[in-house]
């Protein structure tokens, strides 16, 4: 190892130890070997109104000649607001080249959240819009305890805790799929109204690992007996088109009265189209396991039938 690399490694280790000591449970080690970490930052520890997850990967050249590779995860952070915060972090790096800056970044973000809480209404604490970079906050997957028309549903993203008018449905967790350090895991709950969708999402996001996932893609279908229609919707959570693909799978399998959430923890290697395959496989596996489809064989037949119908339509045009 070069002398410079050894020096950087020592400084990184010292900074990591300091961050863990300062922030305690808020500081999470994602991949110690790859130097990937995340920290959940809020405007107020006891009564958070605004929360953001900062995920960082420390390159070998940091802090000497390169900045940390970072990702800001928050559902409300978009457009100019995201650009302004990114510019602030990059300005801190430029002003402190060669120095350890993670603490400065965290406290800058906290200042922004505090300022935001004083100026605006509370935002969602638990979901986030991200792009395909970096990961979550713990290593182990979640372990579970021992004629039809489509009607677009109202936006059910969690903006406040739902009223306790319904019992929270039971939530099941699927077997994780891991590929090139990315992990995918499905979560499923029976739902019969949008209020239950909100409740399940809120309950899931109470789990630090799930709420810190790079993406939480979901879709649901609720059959309305009186109108003979489906109430359904989906959410990409920053993984473009993933929610629509998941909903399409559920339509093909003709499942009803169910919510499926697929968490993805990105491991630093781009998967390309394979990520959509893993998302749908996770969802399909748990739907089959929980008997929302008749059998794996019938699910495959349904998919094959759908492809044939599409090909037939193409040939007719």
Swiss-Prot record:
Keywords: Actin-binding, Cytoplasm, Differentiation, Neurogenesis, Phosphoprotein, Repressor, Stress response, Translation regulation
Source organism, top-level taxon: Eukaryota
Region Disordered, annotated ranges: 292-317
Coiled coil: none
SUPFAM superfamilies: Ribosomal protein S5 domain 2-like, UBC-like
Keyword Phosphoprotein (UniProt): yes
GO biological process entries: cellular response to amino acid starvation; GCN2-mediated signaling; intracellular signal transduction; negative regulation of transcription by RNA polymerase II; neuron projection extension; positive regulation of neuron differentiation; regulation of cytoplasmic translational initiation in response to stress
One Gene Ontology term of the molecular function aspect: actin binding
Note in the entry: The IMPACT locus is imprinted. Paternal inherited gene is expressed, while the maternal inherited gene is silenced.
Homology family: Belongs to the IMPACT family.
Protein name from the UniProt record: Protein IMPACT
Gene source species: Oryctolagus cuniculus (Rabbit)
Organism phylogeny: Eukaryota, Metazoa, Chordata, Craniata, Vertebrata
């Amino acid at each position: 190892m070069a002398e410079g690399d050894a020096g950087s490694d020592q400084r990184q280790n010292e900074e990591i130890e300091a961050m863990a000591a300062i922030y305690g449970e808020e500081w999470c080690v994602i991949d110690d070997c790859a130097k990937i970490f995340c920290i959940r930052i809020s405007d107020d520890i006891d009564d958070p109104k605004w929360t953001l997850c900062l995920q960082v990967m420390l390159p070998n050249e940091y802090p000497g000649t390169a900045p940390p590779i970072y990702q800001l995860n928050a559902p409300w952070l978009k457009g100019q607001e995201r650009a302004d915060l990114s510019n602030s972090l990059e300005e801190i790096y430029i002003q402190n080249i060669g120095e350890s800056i993670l603490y400065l970044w965290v406290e800058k973000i906290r200042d922004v959240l505090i300022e935001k809480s004083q100026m605006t209404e509370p935002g969602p604490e638990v979901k986030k819009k991200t792009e395909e970079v970096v990961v979550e906050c713990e290593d182990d997957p979640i372990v579970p305890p021992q004629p039809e028309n489509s009607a677009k549903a109202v936006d059910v993203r969690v903006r406040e805790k739902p009223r306790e008018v319904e019992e929270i449905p039971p939530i099941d967790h699927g077997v994780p799929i891991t590929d090139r350090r990315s992990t995918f895991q499905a979560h499923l709950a029976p739902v019969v109204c949008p209020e239950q969708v909100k409740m399940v999402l809120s309950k899931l996001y109470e789990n630090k690992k799930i709420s810190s996932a790079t993406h939480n893609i979901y879709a649901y279908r609720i059959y309305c007996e009186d109108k003979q229609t489906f109430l359904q919707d989906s959410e990409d959570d920053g993984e473009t088109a993933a929610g629509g693909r998941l909903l399409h799978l559920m339509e093909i399998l003709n499942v009803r009265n169910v919510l499926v959430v697929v968490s993805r923890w990105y491991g630093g290697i781009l998967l390309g189209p394979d990520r959509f395959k893993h998302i749908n496989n996770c969802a399909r596996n748990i739907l089959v396991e929980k008997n929302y489809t008749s059998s794996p064989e019938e699910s495959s037949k349904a998919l094959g039938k759908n492809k044939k119908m599409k090909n037939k339509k193409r040939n007719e045009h």
